[in-house]
Regions:
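Helix-coil boundary/capping segments in enzymes
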Residues: 1-237
């Protein structure tokens, strides 16, 4: 009920919210070896999301349709559909893109038709915590997408979300996505912020090792184009 949700926003003193899928961010990993199935699944998901919530209900509830770049033609077509229905924000997972030809960097130039349209439209792309396909290499039970049992205690699998976000954003900078599309706006949601210190250190180190590779300072490029939602317990000093 959209209006009931607006009432809750009013009770909490919130002007507007972004609305993300809880389980929808898990399924691309399960289907990644079948790009056609990925497209069919998320086209259906996005139609349901728009029907139930809308993409900009009263300019207060901004539901985020989910996008995969597994088929860039599909992604561009789906983006046009979402933009035509008022989408302000879209959701992707922080992971390599699994295409019919194998995995690719999300900043590969083969995906430029999608990124170009995103930049032109001015919508925000959210890299939301998801099943990004990371493994604990035997230190803990994997299979995030297929198991919803509670954790008995801490293990290294807890760092997978941060590892995925770190690698995703490093790749966007390394592959010069923001240099090609200076109007892009990307947000990191539910990935925390503790990975930032190490990311900035590595970006500076890489710039020194590969002198002349970057047109812009990589750390400043990140700061200009990426907004990060920290966990409440993160030390952001």
């Amino acid at each position: 009920n959209r209006d009931a949700r607006l009432q809750v926003l009013d009770e909490h003193g919130l002007e507007a919210v972004w609305l993300f899928p809880t389980l929808g961010v898990l399924y691309e990993e399960l289907l990644k070896h079948d790009p056609e199935a990925v497209g069919i699944t998320f086209r259906a998901f996005n139609r349901w999301l728009e029907e139930d919530w809308g993409f900009a209900y009263r300019d207060r509830i901004f539901a985020a349709p989910y996008f995969s770049l597994a088929d860039v033609g599909w992604a561009v077509e789906e983006l046009e559909w979402a933009l035509g229905r008022g989408a302000h924000v879209i959701c992707i997972r922080p992971a390599a893109v699994w295409t019919a030809k194998g995995p690719r960097s999300p900043a590969s130039t083969e995906f430029d038709p999608f990124w170009a349209r995103v930049a032109e439209a001015g919508v925000t792309v959210v890299a939301h915590a998801a099943d990004s396909g990371y493994t604990s290499h035997g230190y803990a039970d994997d299979g995030f997408s297929s198991s919803f049992e509670g954790f008995a205690g801490p293990n290294v699998k807890l760092f997978n979300i941060e590892r995925a976000a770190h690698d995703f954003f490093a790749t966007l900078v390394f592959d010069k996505l923001f240099e090609r599309f200076p109007n892009l706006r990307v947000a990191s949601v539910e990935n925390g912020s503790e990975f930032l210190g190490d990311l900035f250190k590595k970006l500076r180190s890489t710039a020194n090792k590969y002198a002349g590779w970057f047109r812009d300072d990589p750390v400043e490029s990140f700061r200009e184009h990426v907004w990060v939602n920290p966990f409440w317990e993160d030390d952001v000093r």
